[in-house]
Amino acid sequence: MDDQALVQVKVWDGWVRLVHWGIVLLLGLSWLSAEEGWIDLHILSGCTVLTLVLFRIAWGFLGSETARFRHFLRSPLAALRHLAHFSRPEPDHGVGHTAAGGWMVLVMLALLLVQPLTGLFSAEEPEFSYGARGPLADLVSPETCAWLTGLHAANFNLILLAAGLHILAVLAYRLVKRHDLVRPMLRGWKWLPAGMASPRFGSPWLATALLALAALAVYGVTRLG
C-alpha cells in the first residue's frame, strides 16, 4: 500500500453487482433444478439469466462508466501485455476491469447469452432429464431441436470452465499482486488515492427501465411457443 492518503471511492454500481452475483446464484440454481427435475424452476432460472444478460449488454452501452464496454475493452495486445507483466508488484489503484479481465467479461456474456437461448429450443427425451422441454422447442424441427439441446449441454461445460478460470484469476490477483477483487464487487467501493476521481454512474431510472424492458422482452419471447 502507498504512503498516499486513501479514501473510499465507489467503483461499481449496484446494477453491475446485481448482474454479477445474481448470475452466480442462478447458475447454481439452474444446475440444481436440472439435476432434480424441477423443470419449471429451471426454465424460470434460465429466463432470469437471459434477462440479466440482456440488461448487462444494454448497460454496457448506456450505463455507468465502469460498466461500459468502451471503458474496459482494449486490444488483445494490451491484454497480453497485462498478463505478461502480471507478476510485477503494483498498488491496487485500478478502476474497473483490467485489460485481460475485460475480455473475460465479454466471453462470459457470450456464453451466458447462448445458454438460455439454446435452452428455449431444447428438449430431452423422456428418459433423460425428466423429459424437459424449452418453451420454444416445438417451433423448430426435431433435428434442430436435438442440435440445440446438445449445444445447450456443451455450452454449460464451457461456462463452468470460464467460471473456473475466473475464480483462479481472482485468487492469483490476491496471492501474487495482493489485489482484492471480491470485496469491491460485493460492496461497490475500494480504497484509492485521494486525488483519483470517482467514475461517472448511470441513471438508476434508466437502469430500471432497461431491466424492465429486458424482462418484458424475455417474457414475450417465451410466449411465442
Predicted regions mapped to residue ranges:
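Membrane-embedded alpha-helical bundles that constitute the cytochrome b-like, heme-associated redox core
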Residues: 1-225
